Amino acid sequence: MHAEGDGEKNALTQSPSADWNPAQYERFRDERSRPFFDLLDLVQPRPEMRVVDLGCGTGELTRELHRQLSARETIGIDNSPAMLAKSAAFAGGGLRFEQKDIDAFASEGDVDLVFSNAALQWVPDHEPLLRRLTAALTQRGQLAVQMPANNDHPSHLTAFAIAGEPPFRAALGGYERQWPVLAPEVYATLLHRLGFREQHVRLQVYAHELESREAVVEWVRGSLLTDYERRLPAELWPHFLERYRQRLLPQLEDARPFFYPFKRVLLWGAR
């Protein structure tokens, strides 16, 4: 899904009603794509690679992944019909797409690169997840993952708080987002235990200049807030969004442009 909403996956990849909104998500395409290219720079290209892109979204960046690696085969996997509807335009020449939950992905040691940009934050229990993804790799396979880690910013904390307030808490059935993304040093330890002979793990702060503080609402509306939108009754969602806007904006500097620091974890390992 290349969708950096942040949260747990039981509720995510199997979420209730609404689908992703590609147009809303891609309003900040340049800013959201920058970490993809940083992650791709960590990958060691090899001839005839078989690549899997977990959470491929619209497929546009998957096409770039396939092209830059000159891969023999690249499979983009996503669970969003709306996102995958866009991907058909990029299929062909060894690149194809499948609708599937990330939890349903499994392979028997025949993948040269498992790549995931801004998707695994939707999946819980990262230690068993990384173990499963490692099992899909060939003997010299690589794992490359980027995940948002901005859950302690007011843009995220405000949404978490409002979800616990009436009338939204009852409408959400008491649902609370869990945060599965671990500290960078924990991922480094996991990669070591899983037998990766080389690794690179870092926390990076991306410096985004948005038009105004109001743009933060639109940014988060295309990612994190989608989880609440699809869980809430249609008549409550506008009220949630308005309360979020009224609560968040006073916490942010009224500046033009508005500086929005966004933390992300990037990890890469080679067996």
Feature locations, PLM:
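Helix-to-beta-strand junctions that scaffold the AdoMet/dcAdoMet cofactor pocket
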Residues: V123-P124, L137-Q139
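A short SAM/SAH-binding and catalytic strip from SAM-dependent methyltransferases
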Residues: L113-H126, A149
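Conserved class I S-adenosyl-L-methionine
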Residues: H2, G7-M49, E60-E64, M83-K86, ...
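A short acidic, Gly/Pro-enriched loop at the edge of an enzyme's catalytic core
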Residues: A106-V114
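Class I SAM-dependent methyltransferase SAM/SAH-binding core
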Residues: V52-F105, P128
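Conserved catalytic/acceptor-binding region of the Class I
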Residues: E127, Q142-E211
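Short glycine-centered segments of the SAM/dcSAM-binding site in methyltransferase folds
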Residues: R50, G141-Q142
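Conserved Class I S-adenosyl-L-methionine
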Residues: T58-E60, Q178-R271
